[in-house]
């Protein structure tokens, strides 16, 4: 039996062993094969990374912006050349099918492309005459060392909306990726090095609680970007803010999709199946609840069940597989417990994912509950799995009222051909990202990922102009130039 490789942290341009003696297995969720072991690093590791990044900031922040942008452009080119390899790593670590993994790689590359526009993004503004012989200019500067805490479900896309932009704008970065998906991170580091990355500018420390707390507490780290669950995100925001750091915390979701009587049912069902069960439901933009008007509900449910029956479940590397496993055994057990809870509380189970449970991997099949109410646990909680709740409503107003009761407000979608309904939905729904006749309203890199309510803690969102503001600070220079006498 081959020896299992133990991974190292990446600090100051080198792969270095952690100070820890604790390692966790990284497991392919479709096969339970142990891929490698990842260190559960210590605060001492974070301190080394932070000191290194702080030292590197002194020179990196002074590098000309076009030079920094060229390195990001080189990185984008290398990522594009290695798309298939990156997608393969996502599939074996995360469980997504190959098509989904390639899609994630594409979104990650888009984020790097956006960051490569740093010269224009860094530009400030000026006013030639604010008083007699007085002008003012507003300049952007990087803020220092930034910490990023990323989740398992998008191991490329989410880190790539963090560190490329922060680094392009002149900061240095410490990434704590998910301990479930380290091999993808290794490949990102390898390609970033080839792109011309200087030592100390980008650092990777694997770990769990100690690493998170080290990032939140270290005085050299000036800002923190987090993506993950609500309980952890709330903790990160509170503790980071207490330590006077700039924090953006993107957390949980319970996204609602509204289907009106005039919706194109074929397109609607196709979109909802993809949104609810793609990536095994493990994404913060997944469709978790459908509220459907009563006049079309029976037909909608029939078509939905018919579509779901065609879903192929299995290893994401296999041809034709749509639904892969959830990330680990704990997630599988948690999902099964929610199915039991839904039954206990009176929801009608019309597609039972327990029928697809297998000992070969962490599989749970597509699960659909009908006749769900807002008092039920399966409506309230973020399940983060291939479980969809359906609520029948009288009209759009009732559907919006139900969605607005949720503590989460990442995204919401509407399927209709009525322009008045679209406008009413846009103006009255409490959610930060809306989709009209599409299932996943995740924005492109140049728009903010703008969750509301308990889906986001902070002021400046990830992506778009918000990310530029988050990773920079401003300096306003006011200057008087006495009028010269050229006569």
UniProtKB/Swiss-Prot annotation:
It comes from the Bacteria. It catalyses: 3-oxopropanoate + NAD(+) + CoA + H2O = hydrogencarbonate + acetyl-CoA + NADH + H(+); 2-methyl-3-oxopropanoate + NAD(+) + CoA + H2O = propanoyl-CoA + hydrogencarbonate + NADH + H(+). NAD(+) binds at residues 150, 152, 176, 179-180, 229, 251, 382. It is an enzyme of class 1 (oxidoreductase). Its EC number is 1.2.1.27. Changing residue 283 to L: At least 50-fold decrease of the second-order rate constant for the acylation step. InterPro entries: Ald_DH/histidinol_DH, Ald_DH_C, Ald_DH_CS_CYS, Ald_DH_N, Aldehyde_DH_dom, MeMal-semiAld_DH, MSDH_GmP_bac. Belongs to the aldehyde dehydrogenase family. IolA subfamily. Disruption phenotype: No effect on vanillin degradation. The keyword Ribonucleoprotein does not apply. Homotetramer. Pathway: Polyol metabolism; myo-inositol degradation into acetyl-CoA; acetyl-CoA from myo-inositol: step 7/7. GO terms for molecular function: malonate-semialdehyde dehydrogenase (acetylating) activity; methylmalonate-semialdehyde dehydrogenase (acylating, NAD) activity. One of its GO terms (biological process) is thymine catabolic process. This is Malonate-semialdehyde dehydrogenase. The active site is at 284 (nucleophile). Catalyzes the oxidation of malonate semialdehyde (MSA) and methylmalonate semialdehyde (MMSA) into acetyl-CoA and propanoyl-CoA, respectively. Is involved in a myo-inositol catabolic pathway. Bicarbonate, and not CO2, is the end-product of the enzymatic reaction. Pfam families: Aldedh. Keywords: NAD, Oxidoreductase. Coiled coil: none annotated.
């Amino acid at each position: 039996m081959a020896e299992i490789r133990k991974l190292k942290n990446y600090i100051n341009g080198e792969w270095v062993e952690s100070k820890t003696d604790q390692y966790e297995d990284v497991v392919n969720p479709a096969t339970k094969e142990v891929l490698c072991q990842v260190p559960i690093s210590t605060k001492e590791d974070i301190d080394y990374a932070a000191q290194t990044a702080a030292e590197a900031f002194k020179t990196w922040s002074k590098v000309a912006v076009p030079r920094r942008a060229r390195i990001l452009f080189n990185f984008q080119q290398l990522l594009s050349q290695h798309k298939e390899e990156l997608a393969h790593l996502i599939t074996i670590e995360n469980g997504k099918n190959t098509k989904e993994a390639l899609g994630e790689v594409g979104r990650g590359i888009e984020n790097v492309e956006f960051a490569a526009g740093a010269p224009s993004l860094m530009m400030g503004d000026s006013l030639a005459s604010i008083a007699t012989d007085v002008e003012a200019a507003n300049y952007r500067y990087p803020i220092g060392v930034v910490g990023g805490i990323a989740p398992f479900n998008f191991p490329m896309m989410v880190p790539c909306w963090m560190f490329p932009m922060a680094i392009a704008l002149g900061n240095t970065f410490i990434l704590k990726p998910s301990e479930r998906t380290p091999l993808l991170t290794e490949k990102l580091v390898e390609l970033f090095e080839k792109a011309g990355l200087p030592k100390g500018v980008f650092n990777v420390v694997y770990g769990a609680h100690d690493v998170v707390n080290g990032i939140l507490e270290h005085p050299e780290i000036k800002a923190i970007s987090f993506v993950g669950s609500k309980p952890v995100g709330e903790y990160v925001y509170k503790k980071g803010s207490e330590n006077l750091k700039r924090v953006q915390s993107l957390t949980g979701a319970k996204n609602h999709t509204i289907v009106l009587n005039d919706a194109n049912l074929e397109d609607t069902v196709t979109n909802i199946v993809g949104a609810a069960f793609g990536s095994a439901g493990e994404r913060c933009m997944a469709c978790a609840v459908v509220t459907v008007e009563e006049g079309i509900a029976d037909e909608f449910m029939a078509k939905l069940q018919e579509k779901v029956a065609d879903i192929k479940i299995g290893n994401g590397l296999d041809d034709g597989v749509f639904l892969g496993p959830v990330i680990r055994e704990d997630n599988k057990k948690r999902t099964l417990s929610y199915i039991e809870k839904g039954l206990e509380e009176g929801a009608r189970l019309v597609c039972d994912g327990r029928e697809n449970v297998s000992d070969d991997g962490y599989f749970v099949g597509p699960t659909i509950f009908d006749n769900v109410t807002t008092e039920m646990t399966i409506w309230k909680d973020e399940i983060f799995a291939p479980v969809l709740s359906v609520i029948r409503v009288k009209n759009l107003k009732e559907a919006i009222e139900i969605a607005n009761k949720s503590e989460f407000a990442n995204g919401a979608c509407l399927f209709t051909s009525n322009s008045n309904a679209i406008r009413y939905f846009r103006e009255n729904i409490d959610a930060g990202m809306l989709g009209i006749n599409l299932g996943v309203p995740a924005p492109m890199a140049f728009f903010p990922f703008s969750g509301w309510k308990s889906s986001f803690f902070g002021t400046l969102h990830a992506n778009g102009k918000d990310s530029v503001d988050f990773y920079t600070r401003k300096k306003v220079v006011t200057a008087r130039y006495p009028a010269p006498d050229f006569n």
